[in-house]
Amino acid sequence: MDLLGAAKPQWPWRRCLAGLLFQLLVAVCFFSYLRVSRDDATGSPRPRLMAVEPVTGAPNGSRCQDSMAAPARPTLLILLWTWPFNTPVALPRCSEMVPGAADCNITADSNVYPQADAVIVHHWDIMRTPSANLPPPTRPQGQRWIWFSMESPSNCRHLEALDGYFNLTMSYRSDSDIFTPYGWLEPWSGQPAHPPLNLSAKTELVAWAVSNWEPGSARVRYYQSLQAHLKVDVYGRSHKPLPQGTMMETLSRYKFYLAFENSLHPDYITEKLWRNALEAWAVPVVLAPSRSNYERFLPPDAFIHVDDFQSPKDLARYLQELDKDHARYLSYFRWRETLRPRSFSWALDFCKACWKLQQESRYQTVRSIAAWFN
């Protein structure tokens, strides 16, 4: 009883303290509400947990996450160890030639060798004595050497001398590190810009322009069998003259062109088809590689393959039939309604190398060019 009576005076004090704390809490909530309401009414932004401000100098108000992106890489320096076939070419900006590529500094000045990020070596120009004609064997750290050839294995000597020197391959072969075909087809960006084929201008039947005449080669043997059944006009050394600058004008008079390659290797489809035949609007007649190989790059009805016929005599008969049947002949040009042929240039090939080097920085070694290319 006495204990209970002694405790009673403490309870009123605790009630008073609790009441004061409650009133203080209500006041804080009330003023917070008034502040938020005022901000909403004036249009001022509510305070955020973290404000992300634009980075000074960043374009278009880029936020700070843009500053985390990798800094722009320095412009690559690419050395052409030689001009192809010792013939200088104009070098435009790669950003204008290859979509998505940045510009590279491309030069044939060998004095920049110690600073070059990559060196392009054109095989034809060093193949006679590779050991004497290659760049210095002590290369700067990280420098990549690119082996470059547009010739077939039949015309590339001393490949074995290059084992272990190169880091990338660059050629017409589709399995090259840098694929540089002689030509390709691309879609029209709009309506086809070329005029319809003028059949009345096609006054001749079959032509062939050949500079490297080898009597024992497969293409010469096939031609000799074919011309026994069909007239073929042959231009070049020891044949009909073809003055400089008149090739396209001359070949455009023909309905068909023998796009016979000088050697028979996979993917080796050269200017004989892309320029001599297609730019002259002549239907190409091809010998090798296989039809399936050609169809990797062309529609099946864009060319005539000799393998489709049992003999040269059968091919001759077919060409004579097409000569008289305009509708069937014109069917070999239907693909031009949606596609157009394009031809390579040295400058474009160098810019493809520029793009590849920008995209892939890993360092590798091609152990044997010969084992891969032959």
Swiss-Prot record:
EC class of the enzyme, as a word: transferase
Places the protein is found: Golgi apparatus, Golgi stack membrane
Membrane-crossing segments per the record: 16-34
Pathway(s) this gene product operates in, as recorded in its UniProt entry: Protein modification; protein glycosylation
Keyword Transmembrane in record: yes
Pfam families in the record: Glyco_tran_10_N (PF17039), Glyco_transf_10 (PF00852)
Chief localization: Golgi
Glycosylation sites: 60, 105, 167, 198
Keywords linked to the UniProt accession: Glycoprotein, Glycosyltransferase, Golgi apparatus, Lipid metabolism, Membrane, Signal-anchor, Transferase, Transmembrane, Transmembrane helix
Protein name in UniProt: 4-galactosyl-N-acetylglucosaminide 3-alpha-L-fucosyltransferase FUT5
